[in-house]
């Protein structure tokens, strides 16, 4: 029995190559006080549940996927439709791979496990502060992530290469956000090639991922707790796997092109002021 398809939450994104939310509208409380409504449900629901399991050493992969899909369900109930394309690419390679994506908000860290883990083992490259935060820290540590400090690029590269090779050899795929910080805008010059370097060294393919998750905004004092914006569409598009050839410059350019082109298309579809 597959532990990830026993219930509606676990199987939420096991819908083939694409997923599209059913039309929904936010309730009165969510429309009037969207951020308060969302965060109260988030922390009293999946976060509390998953943290409780983590404190007991029970934050396993099935729990991770369940909580991830639960968060996605909460977002939809806020009136934010989810559109996902290209999920066949997650299973298009034999063995582990890298998922290299732009980084826009906290939401992708919550949602990606529900898309990827039912199809293959996966963990993240994360900044150290996420592993020491109250509530989130024990959960993130239970996922055996690759931890970087984001203060010394040379040390971060060593950590990613060494930690990445170790996990890839175990068959664990890795999600990498090469941007220095979360941003609604995408600047290729600030999108480093650490994912390409690791893929080349390990001899594994890269699955590029473009995402738009600004429905969960960035906070001014606490970045993870920004304004929630009902009505904004949440979008993810996976591209076909890339095999690194030579120094990887062409593949790095292809990843950036995938992200830039989709962000531009989504802006036109959704409206510049969305």
Sequence positions of predicted segments:
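Membrane-anchoring hydrophobic helices of lipid-metabolizing enzymes
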Residues: 1-96, 111
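Catalytic core of membrane glycerolipid acyltransferases/transacylases, capturing the structured
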Residues: 38, 48-53, 93-152
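Short gly/ser/thr-rich secondary-structure transition/capping motifs
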Residues: 78-85, 157-158, 218-221
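Short acidic-hydrophobic, aromatic-tinged amphipathic segments that line or gate anion-handling sites
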Residues: 84, 146-149, 244
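Residue-level preference for the first positions of well-ordered beta-strands
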Residues: 96-98, 171-177
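Hydrophobic/aromatic ligand-binding patch that stacks against planar heteroaromatic rings
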Residues: 115, 139, 166, 197-198
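A cross-family acyltransferase "interaction/gating" segment
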Residues: 137, 173, 184-250
């Amino acid at each position: 029995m597959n532990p990830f398809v026993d219930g509606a939450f676990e199987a939420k994104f096991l819908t083939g190559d694409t997923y599209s939310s059913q039309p929904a509208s936010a309730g009165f409380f969510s429309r009037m006080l969207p951020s308060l409504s969302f965060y109260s449900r988030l922390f009293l629901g999946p976060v509390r549940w998953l943290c409780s399991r983590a404190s007991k050493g029970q934050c396993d992969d099935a729990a991770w996927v369940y909580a991830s899909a639960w968060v996605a369900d909460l977002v939809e109930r806020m009136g934010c439709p989810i559109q996902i394309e290209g999920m066949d690419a997650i299973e298009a390679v034999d063995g582990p791979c890298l998922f290299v994506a732009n980084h826009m908000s906290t939401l992708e860290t919550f949602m990606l496990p529900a898309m990827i883990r039912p199809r293959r083992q996966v963990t993240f490259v994360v900044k150290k502060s996420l592993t020491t935060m109250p509530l989130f820290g024990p959960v993130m540590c239970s996922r055996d992530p690759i931890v970087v400090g984001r203060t010394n690029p040379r040390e971060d590269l060593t950590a990613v290469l060494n930690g990445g090779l170790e996990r890839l050899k175990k068959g664990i795929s890795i999600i990498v956000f090469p941007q220095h910080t979360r941003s609604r805008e995408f600047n290729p010059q600030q999108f480093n090639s650490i994912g390409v370097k690791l893929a080349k060294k390990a001899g594994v393919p890269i699955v590029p991922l473009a995402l738009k998750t600004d429905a969960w905004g960035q906070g001014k004092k606490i970045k993870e707790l920004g304004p929630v914006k009902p009505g904004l569409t949440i979008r993810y598009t996976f591209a076909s796997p890339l095999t690194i050839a030579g120094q990887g410059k062409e593949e790095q350019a292809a990843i950036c092109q995938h992200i830039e082109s989709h962000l531009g298309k989504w802006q036109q579809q959704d409206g510049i002021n969305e």
